[in-house]
Amino acid sequence: MDSEQPDSLDGWVPLREDLFPEPERHQLRFLVAWNAAKGQFAVTCHDRTAQRRRRERREAGDGGCSWAGVLSPAGFRGAHRQLAALWPALEPCFPPLPPELDAASGAGWGLGRGLWALLWPLLWPAPADPGDSALQELCRQLEHYLGLAAEGCGGATVRDVLFPAPGDSADCEGLSEFRERTLRARLGQTATRLHQVLQDHGKANTMVALMKVYQEEDELYQELVTMATTFFQYLLQPFRDMREVATSCKLGILKSLDEDELGPRRVAALQKEASEWTRQAEEAVGSIQDITVNYFKETVTALTGMQKQMEQDQKRFGQAAWATAMPRLENLKLMLARETLQLMRAKELCLKHRQAEIQRKVEDLPRQGKQLDVVDELEIQCYEIQLELYDVKLEMLRNEETILVTRLDSVKRLITEKQAEVIYYDPCESPEELQSLAPDLELHLGDNRELRALSQQCQRLEAQRGRICSRRALLRNRKDHCRENHQLRLQQAKQSLRHLHQHHSIQMKRDKVKEEEQKKKEWIDHERQKTLERLRAYKEKCPAHRSALKTTCSESMVSNLPGGRSQKRLSTAHHHKTAHPASSKTGSAVPLPEASVRPPEHQDPCGSVPVQAFVPVSDQTLSGSSEDLSLPPQPPAPPLPPPPPPPPPPPLPPALSSFQGTTHQNLGLRTLATEDRPLPLACDPSAGRPCDYQGPGSMDEVLASLRQGKASLRKVETPTLPHPGTSVNEQVLAAIRQGVQLKKVHTGQGVDPGKKSTSDLERSIREALERIKKVSADSEEDNDEPSPTEWDR
């Protein structure tokens, strides 16, 4: 009675199979130090072997390679007693711990390190602690002792003693894991035995011995089916329970939503909970389908091996001897075809489940705001799944045809056997004897009816086989069409990706050019700001420079008014001479600003008429001052006789004449506001002209216009710069007060680009859904036809 198995496993604890394996030697390194704050030893253990392997694998982290903890002196003694019990040779290796350490740790009386730790030294003074050198020597001895213990008792044992792991023991495992492991092991053992029996077919030299092997093989296959069913049913049970719980909870929530009067928040929470239960139920269904596929894979693998081995055995025997084993071969073919058909149906369910998931993802894309490339990717995945589904359906039709062909061969064999039967009758010498043979004749007629029934069954099987062939041809055509669409979608995806890369490269080049232009603009602005600051600093240091410029300019203008060309030239020379002393007085000690000085004269191509290029006044004064500093003063020159009038000069180009006119105007009629502003870096000659100013042909016209008071100059309003502390709204209001005309914006029914992209996305999703549904509908049309194996059960 004691040897019988218990009815329940309550109170039993499963142990691991590899509970006492051969220990692997690891190199351990122990570090011991005294922690004066806690009054305990700090112990650290490093597994150098595991660290070296982790470093070779280039894995991050240090989990499982190092351990650390604190031990009191009493705890060290207890660990030593445990290790010495395992290995008695370790007893004399433990160094003696001084009693002062026990007093420092407070473990001798069990008082802890709380309030008593403050009162105890006042009542009973403790002996002096050992010195640092003694503690360091003691720690080194403990490290050596732990190293010896790891060599004698094993590193795992020392780690478990020093650093006990919290939780359950590692020697036990859960009941569910134990049951699953046991069932899997039994299934593997049965499959191994079946494989060994298949290998023993060559030892059977006679048909009688081979039939015994076949009988043993059938028994092992039935045992394999039983173990596989038990194992996979155990795997299926949690997912079935989850499916039932999720379905019942979902139905309860839907019933509550339909019947109860709930608020909007409660309704939203219940809907979210219902969707979560729906997701869990779908996950459970998917897991059930995957486990079912694995079960049929096991049975199909076993039957395939049995059929192949039997077909090899058929080659060793003749037709007459093999006739006894022929029914078993036909039965194996039928079983293999049926199991393969079940496997294909399970795969079909898995593929349809995946296809439905992709369709739901496509439907959820508008709410998630995904892009068009995600739609294309999901559609391509749907095409791939549909192609796999077509392959599965073709395999199902092939197995159905195999079943029909096997049945058809069996029926034809029966018909042949019936037709080959020969009935012998005794001769009759009288009518009475002939009447006595009537039952035998009726039996013969019954055999003919059986032959007719077999013939009709053969015709039905042929008709079903023809329908299967037509369905297979239709599926192949649809598969080819689906493959063409798949290739087309792949080409479109590649083209769009190529276009995206090309556009991206172009956009990168544009961004690079814009970035370079922005850097160049920033550099120009920075240099301009530096130049303006230098000019402003120069004007602040030389305030008399501008008054001298005004005086010289006014004198030169007055001297130029009554004369002609020769007087203008003399006045210009006099202007240079009079400007030199003033500038030499004011700007002799000031550093010269950085400005480009143009040459005073340029020769035309004919070489006859000199063309003067006017230089800004500041540059003239600076150049004059430098000449006055370097040369001694000269006596005044005697008056020269008037030269003969030169030939009239050719007309100047418009740009040069306008530049000269603008220069004279700026020299003569410069206001105080314009003098205070710094000069720009790049001078634009046409910036100061009015739009209707054509530019005079010579200086006489300029002087005549000045005499008549018709100077084509207009007052330029200086823009008032806003205060740095003013906000944007105040600047806008100030601009409105100055008379800025605001344009009325007409809000038209323009197309929002975001809405346009959303509409494009929705349209693409709708078209993709239509294509997916069309492809799925093409494959689902074949499910309406009855399966030819229904009658086979």
UniProtKB/Swiss-Prot annotation:
Main location: cytoplasm
Keyword Protein biosynthesis: no
Ranges annotated as biased composition (Pro residues): 632-654
Renumbered residue ranges of the record's region Disordered: 556-661, 675-699, 772-793
Family annotation (PROSITE patterns): WH2
Composition bias type Basic residues, residue spans: 566-579
Subcellular compartments: Cytoplasm; Endoplasmic reticulum-Golgi intermediate compartment; Cytoplasmic vesicle membrane; Golgi apparatus, cis-Golgi network
Swiss-Prot/TrEMBL domain comment: The N-terminal region associates with membranes, the coiled-coil region binds to microtubules and the WH2 domains promotes actin nucleation.
The protein's name: WASP homolog-associated protein with actin, membranes and microtubules
Organism: Mus musculus
Gene name linked to the record: Whamm
